[in-house]
């Protein structure tokens, strides 16, 4: 996609992002604005006011950052602190491979910080809390890329938090099979444990900001959404949140122990390492870069630095856990975009994407029975258009569409609640259509970000979506009555049920519920079975 974006614009974005970092200092005198100070367990933090929104940046949610001997160790809880600290600048972004955007990040292993946004003024009523978890294929991403200011201006009756977590080889790395790896039995799912520690901090401190610790919704897109659908399955996590908003990500974004070990061994071979002690001598940037070159999101090796179905934190069978009711007490709003894979088509270009898709499909066909192989081939044969289109559609079914419907099915069958959507507005950029992540800027109320959409979607439409998301966070139901709807019209969003299978079609000028079987989001006969396989 880099050829679609003006280099001058990229440089402006990089410069802007870098300006958001800085050192938050300890305040040793009494010369600070007390109205902007919030006392938390691990210190008093002083924010900055931007219009009518108070922003707190770079608050540590751990007692010690995961550096030195704490690399590949579970996050350390905070300790009480009576100090007063600035919360003016973003903390460091986790180590990750360099790309167009990530090259702007100030990276480091000391990366476990969070940001809080709240409206100015006090309220007698505790406000619902929304916690954002960023995406990036579990390999990239950071809180600095997401500014909730405009979202908060429109929705001052909630509080928003964005939490950082370790990604890539430093966040998801199996080490316990190594000769000196027995003390690193959590390394395979550290990114998720970081998220839980961040949620624990929110639970213990958000009341001081005016938030309700018993009404927390976790919200993510892509790998952030995958995180949000995995966190309910980790023992002890559900006390920190009650709702999930998951955009374009599902719990199938995981790997087996065997795949995780293969990933570790390949990185060690590339670095010439034999033990954890050897790996400890390699700096974080080198580790991230090496893993990114081997398993980056655009590679076709079929193994990724994803969360591991380790049987310790995540169940070995994710879908069985959902079917057995592991998340039935958590309310879900989730879905995806109708042309998810078009974003990757736009990145690669048709020729490279076609070759990538062919390799990807052949790699996964090897896992299937002969009957299943013929079902997939039949599905591909029925798709017309350009040579890349069969791969575009079937991989979209594998990674996005079918898992979303499976999530609705299992959650509903177990007695839980699922509100499901399909986002349909299209980008004006070549090949993009309604591709992966084109909706994010609209939901953040950021009209200046058209990098993926190529345009601003209808203003009223954006307001309706944001109101639905906030209404779900408040009440557990995204439906809008006419008196609170931005266009004065009521929108009744039905729960997914096993008979009607209704989803909310988020058309730009016609938001309406529709039976999944009418919309044909998933091919029940030829592609739904793909969800029985974990495809990293």
Q: PLM features: what roles do these ranges have?
A:
Residues 2-189, 213, 452-465, 476-482, ...:
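Non-catalytic accessory segments of hydrolases
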Residues 101-276, 322-344:
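Serine-hydrolase-like catalytic core of hydrolytic proteins
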